[in-house]
């Protein structure tokens, strides 16, 4: 009988686990890993060889596993041995077809790529559909820290089937970035035996092994099956073969031979016999996630028992008993620095203001030190400023000088050379004039202050011309010299009798060997005893604090655990075992602060002790596993079952009572406030006087409509992106009571978002609800759930920046100039509405169709008041490289600062998505702008286009063009695009169909996106009439847009009647006046029904267009046809399809009143933009009340854009 697929999978898991457990006893081969990220090491061949040398036969990677720049024909079979990675795994920029990480079990994530990702698979593709296709990580079952990122892997198979929730910890799931492309035709399908269709590749062996999401509720982490008895030990990672800590496939923390442990066996154990910490013969060092008896070669041991490659700060490396260890430095760690005349100071005369910082933390000077008068005067020739005397304190760390010390200048108000108070030795290997190793000449000091100087190995000493210097003659210099022929020249200093007259003599506590100054710490040696570096008369043996004992004429402090005795000695020597009486407790011969509690002892047992009435520590009973308070078993019960449980119960009851009291107090407070408000409201309603406005602004009221949606009215389909504010979803809006689906983008704040973030998203909703323009993204609605959600129109082509980067080889001059016109129109509309955008960039322009773009992202936009001309920002993150200079320096934002950002946006388009000021830090932008530097002229731009950009970047904001002027300039250029933009092969370029866009495919590849209605179409009234003039927000037209282009105008809307939505705007969107239409577009594709004027459309055969509302118009001309751009001087009459030659065939009887059809020359429209009031409504009427058609010569009135819907009909 053949075993089932599930049985075979289980058997395979068991065999793998047994092999891993058996192999755990063997020492695994480790390798360091790399941290090169995306850096290429030499040629492709050199890079690959470096990779092969690093990971050949490697099983554990201590650092990061980075597989980059591997070409198609290279063999990566040496990666099969890798089982564990301590850092992150980066697989990027490869064209090799298969990367066999078949035995990789765990990624620990001790270091993360971009501080977020433990596994990053990025841009693994080449030309001609080559690249990474297979990544069989069939044994990867655990990522301890970090998330996963996939991006730009167009032919990588099966990754979309993996259940990452089983591998990644739940806390990191929100950081996942999964840009996966599915290729069912070319990729192998998962084996039918794979659980839930999850696999790493074709075949049963590549099925994903689930060890977390299938576990029973009783399991804390991993399991080997669905039963509660299949739970793994909590020390296990990536699964197990049994319930014990020795049955783990991989250890979560440390592996000690075949057992998983929380920590490695300690190096020291408590000995209850000697009352000391003894060396543990079973102790081990931690090396990565493994416990080892000794650290590998070239590693050093820390105090905590870890193997590291280098000691930390304040530690130095030393060898003891054949083991390299890290020892804590006594003071600053040794640091050798070059002296004057060596290395970087080769041509330097003296320590000065520019080089003094190089001596910071130096303990040894290799060479000489000179301090000359030029240091304090400065040097105008070399532009060296005077030295600040306080900076000489840097030299206090210097203990050794291998050459000589020359001091010919010193601060006048300093009385000694205390900057060198820690100098211990002057070796004199080089000498001034070949003679002197210490020279102090012409200073105003009273003492030398070299209190730590113990040796001058070679060279003479000269101390001369210091008119106030005393004490120098008291020093026994011969005792400091290293050779008998060394001499001193101490002359022309202050006379000895003058020094005695002013009491500049050695302290009485100094011995006859002399002193360096007047203080007791300046003595060369002490007359009596010393405490540290200072001479004292006597030690604190019987009185005083702290208590001391005498050793070699030095006062040594007693151990802190010794109890001070009244008029008696406190201790007899060093350590806690020489105390006369203990301050706290006594454990054997030692004084201790507390009795041992839970200290690791022999045989991995914890040692517990209690103190008796005499504060002597005694061992607890062997069965007392949590400590004791007395002898025997009865002492064990005091802590666990005595006061502990009642105290816990008391704490719980007390906490509950406190919560109840607080709740009652809050309730009473809210009740009281409600009553006060109610009374205040009643009193106000009874007032007869009305409050008169004191400062009317005269500004028109904002009558924008804000739609409040229920959460049941829309459905989230997939995540489009996430950030600090929250998450953006693709979804469908299904209005209540209507059978339509509208694709939308849903912007949702994170849980527990701050009140500031809530305010910011509501401010953004206010701005978006206040706008209504074809080239500005508008708000469809807002949902006020616990996390505020904004619902906007979905743009399936993504942002304009990504769009031009993806299609840069197919974008012609016409499209670029049209986009410039449309963005300028949108910004001009915002300026008319007194809105400052503050974040205009190509990334914040969305593509509705290739001919229609919209401005979005109003997160930084501000609405100016009636009297405001500019906005002053307070702080926050801002796009420096797109901002005007006044915005960077003074945080001033105006409509003219938006013009600057517009210029940068145009530059992004003309360079097909290049980064502005690439390689220049944002902190340097303001300085280079002030110096006159600007973005370079794009290669495709003529000087006409570039001069417009330059005008946008003028320092004087008033000198920049207005958006109205920019519309005129770019509209003129769009009528003759190849004159202003020079693109090779421009006449043959055309944008691909929507489905060729990667973003479009990823966005629309959902079965829920069928039979949808575009938001613009839903909001624009369908063919028919309003119920009454009172409900209409626009004047009634004789004809509206038809629902089909192959029928006469019909009065049919979605609900089968002639009524339209009351909240819809008539003539909401207009086609771009500069959009390009070819004869082929007109003859062979669907021509959209005019929305603004009554234009006729010739009937077409019934089968030519299945659903004209969703049909996409071709974007490229037919071969052999000349492309006709809109030109106001062309003869548009020659094409009768653009003229109003037909009358509506359906008129409701409710509109027979002539008054409803009488139009005046000045139309009062409720549209937001006065430009559209002027340009898109006829100003003349026929006697019969029907509007006249637009002037054929004016391209602004022609409907030449493709359909507004970007969705293809089913």
Curated annotation (Swiss-Prot):
The record marks 1018 as: Important for interaction with PIK3C2B. The keyword Membrane applies. The modification Phosphoserine is found at residues 229, 697, 993, 997, 1028, 1041, 1044, 1070-1071, 1166. A lipid is attached at residues 1051, 1146 (S-palmitoyl cysteine). The modification Phosphothreonine is found at residues 680, 695, 1043. There is a cross-link at residues 718, 739, 756, 759, 869, 931, 962, 972 (Glycyl lysine isopeptide (Lys-Gly) (interchain with G-Cter in ubiquitin)). Endocytosis and inhibition of the activated EGFR by phosphatases like PTPRJ and PTPRK constitute immediate regulatory mechanisms. Upon EGF-binding phosphorylates EPS15 that regulates EGFR endocytosis and activity. Moreover, inducible feedback inhibitors including LRIG1, SOCS4, SOCS5 and ERRFI1 constitute alternative regulatory mechanisms for the EGFR signaling. The modification Omega-N-methylarginine is found at residue 1199. Residues 1113-1137 are annotated as: Disordered. It is a single-pass type I membrane protein. Residues 1-24 form the signal peptide. SUPFAM superfamilies: Growth factor receptor domain, L domain-like, Protein kinase-like (PK-like). The active site is at 839 (proton acceptor). Residues 25-647 are extracellular. Keywords: ATP-binding, Cell membrane, Developmental protein, Disulfide bond, Endoplasmic reticulum, Endosome, Glycoprotein, Golgi apparatus, Hydroxylation, Isopeptide bond, Kinase, Lipoprotein, Membrane, Methylation, Nucleotide-binding, Nucleus, Palmitate, Phosphoprotein, Receptor, Repeat, Signal, Transferase, Transmembrane, Transmembrane helix, Tyrosine-protein kinase, Ubl conjugation. Residues 1127-1137 have a biased composition (Polar residues). Binding of the ligand triggers homo- and/or heterodimerization of the receptor triggering its autophosphorylation. Heterodimer with ERBB2. Forms a complex with CCDC88A/GIV (via SH2-like region) and GNAI3 which leads to enhanced EGFR signaling and triggering of cell migration; binding of CCDC88A requires autophosphorylation of the EGFR C-terminal region, and ligand stimulation is required for recruitment of GNAI3 to the complex. Interacts with ERRFI1; inhibits dimerization of the kinase domain and autophosphorylation. Part of a complex with ERBB2 and either PIK3C2A or PIK3C2B. Receptor tyrosine kinase binding ligands of the EGF family and activating several signaling cascades to convert extracellular cues into appropriate cellular responses. Known ligands include EGF, TGFA/TGF-alpha, AREG, epigen/EPGN, BTC/betacellulin, epiregulin/EREG and HBEGF/heparin-binding EGF. Ligand binding triggers receptor homo- and/or heterodimerization and autophosphorylation on key cytoplasmic residues. The phosphorylated receptor recruits adapter proteins like GRB2 which in turn activates complex downstream signaling cascades. This is Epidermal growth factor receptor.
